[in-house]
């Protein structure tokens, strides 16, 4: 049987402190360390050293240091680690093309060059496995939906897909006569939950670059980027529900959500590298990335089912009857929207010693409170110019709460290369990326926005800092070169199945899920084949 509460009791309930739901959008703003094996092997700390194709997408001035044209292609496997999944079991190793590009070097003066480049890179690899399980104490997913409604927090644009599914399948809002029960709110507590998530896909970055130098002292570069998003996420979530005594398990409720996001984005990057001392190889680099202006579409199919019967009590006769709530309900959603990612600013230094040792250090900063979810307005046709136009506006409530959930992130990259012989090189690198999420942030399902209204899941993870270590080898003979790199990356986080709810009147109505420690661990092997001419 369900817990039944009158509206009068719930009228005085108050939701906990508000926070923002930008967790889905934030995935699109993350960037991975990827590129040529030389670049990855040195931890990506080449924004001042330059002379590598991968710097097209980081510091556009980098290709300006090249004195020979070159082409390169990079590929290799990536392994994601995670607990074994029983429902969404699949491959943990993927193999693909990570980089392909080239730079054409043209001499325009005695000491000046004008170079043109193109580079394809997987700037973001979404592949990830996540598994979490925990016990509940007077808590459940359907309970949080009930508390949300009867606390007066349920509005037109925050009545989510998840709320709708639980409403029809579990809450018993449809009586024997097919009418909506408005006098009572009903819910089940759960003994615990288990969840499995599988994320797949990537963001392809197509970068077009022009770079050059002035008297071999100052190097300038400009890159135009086109990004193509392919993201797929499958979530399985199950709860073991309890009867009214909170002692006996009566059955399970299962949610299966399949979500896909696709679209394109544009960005611009500017960079400069300078040698402040004429006879020294010491270099200083600086660069800036505009936001990526995305237009995206997300579609999802969400299914909720239960494996037990629900019985109601007739208020007139006191007899129980089998409720006519469906045991299963499916919901399809689709949403087009725009997303602007934060600006990126970077500084770098690099130095070489006797053409044997190369050292690089890079610092980047990006303020994720500037992540901007935008609502698309209606298209219109301008008959004067003969063109279609599309306007959008910032989701004001989403934007306000983004500042409460996200924060500025600092990235530090260090790398070195040693030429053991003129043909053979050894490389190593390290990255530290500070957290983008505040530890106090949570996915607020009470915000009146499209993001809440079309939410098909409620879970979130506050990811902490990222640490990467890299190693690499290089071999060159004549104009041909080949490189290999290994990278290990780890990001720990706190997983929550849904937001916290606290009732100021009756603590038994609280919904307080505990954090579950999760970790995103990745290993990658990368190989590059290239030719200079």
What is the predicted role of each segment?
Residues 40-54, 85-89, 193-199, 514:
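Asp/Glu-centered strand-loop micro-motifs enriched in Gly/Pro and often flanked by an aromatic residue
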Residues 1-23, 529, 533:
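Bacterial Sec-dependent N-terminal signal peptides
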Residues 39, 53-55, 68-74, 97-99, ...:
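A common structural microfeature
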Residues 78, 90-91, 466-468:
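Strand-loop-strand
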């Amino acid at each position: 049987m369900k817990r039944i509460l009158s509206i009068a009791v719930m009228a005085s309930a108050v939701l906990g402190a508000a926070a923002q739901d930008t967790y889905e959008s934030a995935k699109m703003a993350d960037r991975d360390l990827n590129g040529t094996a030389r670049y990855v092997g040195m931890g990506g700390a080449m924004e001042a050293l330059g002379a590598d194709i991968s710097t097209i997408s980081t510091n556009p001035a980098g290709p300006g240091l090249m004195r020979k044209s070159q082409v390169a292609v990079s590929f290799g496997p990536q392994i994601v680690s995670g607990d074994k999944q029983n429902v969404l079991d699949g491959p943990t190793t993927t193999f693909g093309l990570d980089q392909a590009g080239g730079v054409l070097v043209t001499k325009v003066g005695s000491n000046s060059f004008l170079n043109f480049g193109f580079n394809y890179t997987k700037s973001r690899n979404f592949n990830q496995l996540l598994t979490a399980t925990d016990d509940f104490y007077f808590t459940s997913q359907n309970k949080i939906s009930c508390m949300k409604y009867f606390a007066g927090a349920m509005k037109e644009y925050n009545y989510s897909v998840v709320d709708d599914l639980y409403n029809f399948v579990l809450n018993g809002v449809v009586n024997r006569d097919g009418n909506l029960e408005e006098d009572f709110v009903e819910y089940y507590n759960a003994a615990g939950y288990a969840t499995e998530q599988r994320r797949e896909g990537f963001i392809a970055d197509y970068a077009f670059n022009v770079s050059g130098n002035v008297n071999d002292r100052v190097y300038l570069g400009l890159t135009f980027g086109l990004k193509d998003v392919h993201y797929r996420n499958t979530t399985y979530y199950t709860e073991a529900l309890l009867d009214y005594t909170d002692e006996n398990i009566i059955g399970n409720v299962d949610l299966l959500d399949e979500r896909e996001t696709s679209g394109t984005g544009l960005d611009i990057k500017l960079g400069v590298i300078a040698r402040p001392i004429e006879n020294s190889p010491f270099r200083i680099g600086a660069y800036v990335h505009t936001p990526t202006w995305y237009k995206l579409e997300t579609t999802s199919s969400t299914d909720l089912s239960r494996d037990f019967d629900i019985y109601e009590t007739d208020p007139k006769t006191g007899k129980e009857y089998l409720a006519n709530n469906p045991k299963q309900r499916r919901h399809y959603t689709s949403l087009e929207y725009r997303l602007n990612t934060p600006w990126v600013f970077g500084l770098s230094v690099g130095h070489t010693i006797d053409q044997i040792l190369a050292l690089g250090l890079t610092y980047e900063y990006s303020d994720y409170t500037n992540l901007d979810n935008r609502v698309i307005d209606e298209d219109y046709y301008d008959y004067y110019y003969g063109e279609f136009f599309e306007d959008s506006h910032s989701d004001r409530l989403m934007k306000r709460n983004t500042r409460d959930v996200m924060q500025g992130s600092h990235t530090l990259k260090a790398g070195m290369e040693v030429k053991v012989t003129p043909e053979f090189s050894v490389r190593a690198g390290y990255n530290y990326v500070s957290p983008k999420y505040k530890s106090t942030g949570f996915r607020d399902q009470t915000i009146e926005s499209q993001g809440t209204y079309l939410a098909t899941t409620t879970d979130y993870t506050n990811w902490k800092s990222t640490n990467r270590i890299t190693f690499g080898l290089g071999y060159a003979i004549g104009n041909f070169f080949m490189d290999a790199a290994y990278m290990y990356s780890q990001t720990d986080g706190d997983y929550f199945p849904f937001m916290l709810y606290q009732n100021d009147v009756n603590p038994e109505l609280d919904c307080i899920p505990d954090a579950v420690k999760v970790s995103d661990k990745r290993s990658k092997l990368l190989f590059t084949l290239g030719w200079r001419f």
